Amino acid sequence: MPEQFLHGVEVVEIDSGPRPIRTVRSSVIGLIGTAPDADEDLFPYHSPILIAGKRSEAAGLGRDGTLPAAIDDIFDQTGAMIVLIRVPDWFGEEEWPSFEEEFEGPWLPNVGQIIGGIDDETGQYLGIQAFLAAENEVHVTPRILIAPEFSHHPAVANELLSVAERLRAVVIAD
């Protein structure tokens, strides 16, 4: 049993690029948000994408939405490993709310997409739940979860905390 316990810091190494990237496993950031101008092939909706320490890997996101600004802010501090999840700008591509629905209650675009869940037809994780698939898809687990400009909503913060508990991660909320 003692040989299974890790005494110290665990390091993850990604060697898919021209040179290996090493980072502490507990410093992988999970970032969820919007990027309406992103390249659909490089950044599909609700899929974990690994950005391994270079701004150039995020070039296909465009300039609009919450993800490009958040990635710029992160890389202004350090070259971090980021597991990125892109969600649609609205409830769905063709599911724009009517004028009456928009003004009946609080105007919260994207909150439902950010919170996510599980697709009934495909079984795919959606929104924040997609962080649970990161280990299988990109071979790293995010340990710091952030949802810039959305985590101040109680429902989003609660979902982040729920997923963080399952991943043994921490949440940084607005």
Task: Describe each PLM feature range.
Residues 1-174:
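Surface-exposed assembly/interface segments
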